[in-house]
Amino acid sequence: MTDYLLLFVGTILVNNFVLVKFLGLCPFMGVSKKLETAMGMGLATTFVMTLASICAWLIDTWILIPLNLIYLRTLAFILVIAVVVQFTEMVVRKTSPVLYRLLGIFLPLITTNCAVLGVALLNINLGHNFLQSALYGFSAAVGFSLVMVLFTAIRERLAVADVPAPFRGNAIALITAGLMSLAFMGFSGLVKL
């Protein structure tokens, strides 16, 4: 049980996909201007990452390894992610048309979000079992969502702050992301390896 708790906390804080592994930076920078959009993107990404991790583990364990088709792993995972994203897009369109319009192009771009593919590939490379894969996908997504919401809150405050002209816009956003990354590095002392 403590292994699962360590995996959960470690993936969210210590090995955060955005601030430590630098995966998923496109939606991190692109959707982080309004809190509602960031929360919606975080929820959609959480759903996709968790479901894609589970499906990727199942396909790898039951199809690719038994048939000795491991060389098709990346292609198979990309196809799985595309199917899961299309399913998510249909669900969001039916349940929340406003969120669907707010997310715009970023919802289909979850397909190309390298964090989603990274979670699926890392699950296999780390030798996770089914529960660990599901938990790892969920924790990575929670970490992604947490960082995105925090970053969005900071960006909203910076939008009304008196920032010097050369630092306005993306410049201060990148500086803020770097400072957040440094802050999250402090969590690495929580886990002794």
UniProtKB/Swiss-Prot annotation:
Say yes or no: keyword Lyase present.
Answer: no
Question: Coiled-coil region(s) at which residues?
Answer: none
**A Gene Ontology CC term for this entry?**
plasma membrane
Q: From its record, what is one biological process in GO terms? A: electron transport chain
List localization entries: Cell inner membrane
Membrane-spanning parts? 5-25, 39-59, 63-83, 102-122, 134-154, 171-191
- Record-listed E.C. numbers: 7.-.-.-
Q: What topology does the record note for this protein and the membrane?
A: Multi-pass membrane protein
UniProt superkingdom:
Bacteria
Keyword Cell membrane set for record: yes
Q: Which InterPro entries match?
A: Ion_transpt_RnfA/RsxA, NqrDE/RnfAE, NqrDE/RnfAE_oxidrdctase
Q: Check the record and name the HAMAP family matching this protein.
A: RsxA_RnfA
Role played: Part of a membrane-bound complex that couples electron transfer with translocation of ions across the membrane. Required to maintain the reduced state of SoxR.
Q: Which PANTHER family match?
A: INTEGRAL MEMBRANE PROTEIN OF SOXR-REDUCING COMPLEX (PTHR30335), ION-TRANSLOCATING OXIDOREDUCTASE COMPLEX SUBUNIT A (PTHR30335:SF0)
Q: What NCBIfam families would the database entry show?
A: PRK05151.1, rnfA
Subunit structure of this chain's protein: The complex is composed of six subunits: RsxA, RsxB, RsxC, RsxD, RsxE and RsxG.
Spell out the family assignment given in the record's similarity comment. Answer: Belongs to the NqrDE/RnfAE family.
Q: What is this protein called?
A: Ion-translocating oxidoreductase complex subunit A
Q: Which organism is it from?
A: Shigella boydii serotype 4 (strain Sb227)
Which gene does this sequence derive from? rsxA
